Structure formats: structure tokens, C-alpha cells
Amino acid sequence: MPLSDWCCGICEEAPLGRAYTQTWMETGCGPHGVTALGQQELKDCLRARSGGTASSVDWIMEAARGSLNVHNCLIKFGRRD
């Protein structure tokens, strides 16, 4: 699946309607947000998506607009918008 689609699926089904693996949901997202493993995967994902840096997550917020779970995970990840 395209990397951008995977990134948009953090913590829940993607806004595009694609479902992501239960394994990632169990290991990457805890009850209070992204777990340590999930944070590393998110960092790797952001780095790959942005061409080498993880300085901005604006694109994922745009893609996941209206998605409370994704927003909560990003807050846990350390960015507040």
C-alpha cells in the first residue's frame, strides 16, 4: 500500500476507508496514544514521507482532518496544533 495511505491510518482506519493491520493497532497505539514502538514507526514514516526530515506533520493533519484518534496520537507524539 502507498506509504501516505499507511501514515494516514495511524490508530484507526484511514480517512480513505482502508483498514490497517490489527497488529499495528495493538503495538503502535496504546490507550493514551502512540506507544514507544508506534512513535518510532511514526518518526520513520514521517522521515520517509518528507524526504529525510520529520520536521512537519502538517500533511498528516490535513489528511486526517476530523480524526480525533489520529489527532490524539499526534499530540502524544509531541505536536500541538
From Swiss-Prot:
Q: Where does the record place it?
A: Cytoplasm
Gene Ontology CC = cytoplasm
UniProtKB keywords: Cytoplasm, Disulfide bond
Tissue specificity as recorded in UniProt: Expressed in placenta, heart, lung, liver, pancreas, skeletal muscle and brain.
Name under which the protein is recorded: Putative chemokine-related protein B42
Question: What highest taxon heads this organism's lineage?
Answer: Eukaryota
Disulfides per UniProt: C7-C73, C8-C29, C11-C45
Q: Does the keyword Acetylation apply?
A: no
Q: Where in this chain does the entry annotate a coiled-coil region? A: none
